[in-house]
Amino acid sequence: MKKIDIKILDKRIGDVFPLPTYTTSGSAGLDLRVCTQAPQHLSPGETRLLPTGLAVHIADPHLAAMILPRSGLGHKNGIVLGNLVGLIDSDYQGELMLSVWNRSQIDFLINPGDRLAQMVFVPVVQVELNIVSEFTSSQRGSGGFGHSGRQ
């Protein structure tokens, strides 16, 4: 198993709030909690940047992290990430922040310690671009949106 350095910036993590964990043995994402000092009221349509109290240094250029919304919050409450998906590069060392967007029509209360997002580590392949004047033909060619059908 690959180990990633994580720095706890908020002393409540591991004491008042649990350390990030995988909820089940089959979970792909580590739950991320909001580490604010007070509850946050998010009005309809409002976005806000909230701290997680954690910094991460992946260090391996063949890995990145993606910050993804928790599905229940978006479906049931209209609370999603303002940037939809956050990409954490391997050389970033700052605090993980969550851009939270209330796309519902009612106020939403976020309490300190609430799980609002999840972090998934993914492989990265950096490519070298090869400039060509033509592509080798393929069966699909340049067929785009809907070209391959629905069935």
Curated annotation (Swiss-Prot):
Substrate binds at residues 70-72, 83, 87-89, 97. Pathway: Pyrimidine metabolism; dUMP biosynthesis; dUMP from dCTP (dUTP route): step 2/2. HAMAP family: dUTPase_bact. Keywords: Hydrolase, Magnesium, Metal-binding, Nucleotide metabolism. Its EC number is 3.6.1.23. Its cofactor is Mg(2+). It is an enzyme of class 3 (hydrolase). One of its GO terms (molecular function) is magnesium ion binding. CDD domains: trimeric_dUTPase. This enzyme is involved in nucleotide metabolism: it produces dUMP, the immediate precursor of thymidine nucleotides and it decreases the intracellular concentration of dUTP so that uracil cannot be incorporated into DNA. It catalyses: dUTP + H2O = dUMP + diphosphate + H(+). Belongs to the dUTPase family. This is Deoxyuridine 5'-triphosphate nucleotidohydrolase. It comes from the Bacteria. GO terms for biological process: dUMP biosynthetic process; dUTP catabolic process.
